[in-house]
Amino acid sequence: MPDLNKSIFENAKSMPLVCAHRGSASGNIPCNTLAAFGAALMQGADMIELDVAVSADGKHYVFHPGMERAYLKIRSLIRLLPSKKVDKLRLYNPDGTKTQYGVNTLAEAFDFLRGRCYINVDKFWTDVPGISRAIRESGVEKQVVVKTGTSARELREVREHASDFMFMPIVRSVDDVTDALAAQGVNCIGAEVLFKTLGEPCCSPAYIEEMHKKGRILFANAEVYDHKAVISAGLTDDASVTQGPEAGWGKLADLGFDVIQTDWPGLLKNYLLSRVPSSGKAGAPNI
């Protein structure tokens, strides 16, 4: 696990941090559950990514909005249901069988992960004020990384409610916001970058070097949620598993990315550890 007494920059020096996408789901254990988070930590994940959905009466749950039909076999959305109904729902496993696992609250997830790893809060933009309060109430401010898109509304809400949290804007192709955010007092620790080709500015050696000189980290997505959605130029989990880890994860590490998000945390962690010499970093020199 990362040393949470150190900065995220320091923890990423020896090798890229492993971010487990919705934990590690397999067998009967669904994603975005405490069980999936525990499984990811057992495999060496440094960061857990989780999604947040808000019920009709404002309660925060760990669930990917819009995936209700896939994971809960219901036609409604959590945002349209009162919390008393959400609390009774049960998740389904990949075979379509109902499990014993319910939809965890965000407070339960924070309590489970407190002091154990970084927590990457996705869908933060759905309720920046409310999720920010939940983070503070749970006392996990120093281990949470929040992110939003780059719309004026989203960035305004971050400035107003979450400027002290570790924040990463999600940028596609070109980063034209991190410098401005830092100048506005936002604790902008870097960026999550999406790119279709390796020729795009946000994955160029010059940009990566510049970001590292400014003490910022870069977050890449190797997970594949839809093979038609290209967000890391094909340097994916699929490529890493089917062609060998150097075909995906290795190239992301060589480019200098500091955090790699994956659905295969154990495989990625073992691969990165195998690249670390007796002294040095598993990948291109960065911070």
Put a short name on every predicted segment.
Residues 1-287:
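Phosphate-group recognition and catalysis centered on beta-loop-alpha active-site segments
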